[in-house]
Amino acid sequence: MRVLGIETSCDETGIAIYDDEAGLLANQLYSQIKLHADYGGVVPELASRDHIRKTVPLIQAALKEAGLTCKDIDAVAYTAGPGLVGALLVGATIGRSLAFAWDVPAIPVHHMEGHLLAPMLEDNSPEFPFVALLVSGGHTQLISVTGIGKYELLGESIDDAAGEAFDKTAKLLGLDYPGGPVLSRMAQKGEVGRFVFPRPMTDRPGLDFSFSGLKTFASNTIHNNSDDEQTRADIARAFEDAVVDTLAIKCKRALEQTGFKRLVMAGGVSANRALRIKMEEVMAKLGGEVFYARPEFCTDNGAMIALAGMIRLKGEVNDSLGVIVKARWPLSELPPL
């Protein structure tokens, strides 16, 4: 069984082919970073138009990479939400159309379920149950996962997502877009302890997050200090340490609350080196294990959508020809398998 996966929820066009026996057969990705760089963020209209240009050629490239033709595809999975509506409609329309033309099932996939399942692309994949930390530019959530579609929201950000805070603070430091990864590289040169940022909402019970205050704290710190390279690196280090510590504290609480011994990290920020090191330390002390995908599968990609589609194919598939996408879509609305 082979599933073609299509990801167009934001500013990456991702196409992949997943085989239930052989694993990942093809993975094609086009990033729109250069397209949006001059604007300092994603422009939805430009994103949609670029997905229109890139999606079909990338599907052709994926088929060629896998040595397959359309006749070898058994289902088409596409991201149906959450995300930018215009961008989602591109992938959904193409996915539905191809499925109809090829006479195979079309499977709408939840973008965050794709991220959550991405570590299962690795040889060392997690078993249920586990706590999932979904951490990206648009989401920061802690979720109890006891099976496919069996998701309970434990906590989430009440304002900025962690990845959004990274990008905004990077912009304050004068770093190029997208600034989060650049800030992390700069932080490696920073001095530990020169600046100390707060660990928001860790002094009270609960598993919710808040990162907007860190951005304000960073802005004030930048304004009140010199603009030399070392100072900027020290501020970057203090900011990253604060975010990483906050995430670690909340993850530890979630694991203690659920009694689970497995932690899954997913989403773009899960590729952060400092966060991975910290979580390895936390799980070692708890006698548990942390799982995450390789960096290229942490950010948006077609492989996670193809895998999620393969898994969802085992459940009930909607055969209607309607193209429905959702800008907002709670994970809790997904049916269990």
Curated annotation (Swiss-Prot):
GO cellular component, one term: cytoplasm
Principal subcellular localization: cytoplasm
PANTHER family assigned: TRNA N6-ADENOSINE THREONYLCARBAMOYLTRANSFERASE, TRNA N6-ADENOSINE THREONYLCARBAMOYLTRANSFERASE, MITOCHONDRIAL
Binding-site list for Fe cation: H111, H115, D300
Location(s) in or outside the cell: Cytoplasm
Function: Required for the formation of a threonylcarbamoyl group on adenosine at position 37 (t(6)A37) in tRNAs that read codons beginning with adenine. Is involved in the transfer of the threonylcarbamoyl moiety of threonylcarbamoyl-AMP (TC-AMP) to the N6 group of A37, together with TsaE and TsaB. TsaD likely plays a direct catalytic role in this reaction.
Name of the protein in question: tRNA N6-adenosine threonylcarbamoyltransferase
Gene, per the UniProt record: tsaD
EC number: 2.3.1.234
Protein family per UniProt: Belongs to the KAE1 / TsaD family.
Cofactor binding, note field: Binds 1 Fe(2+) ion per subunit.
InterPro entries named in the record: ATPase_NBD (IPR043129), Gcp-like_dom (IPR000905), KAE1/TsaD (IPR017861), Peptidase_M22_CS (IPR017860), TsaD (IPR022450)
Keywords in alphabetical order: Acyltransferase, Cytoplasm, Iron, Metal-binding, Transferase, tRNA processing
Names of required cofactors: Fe(2+)
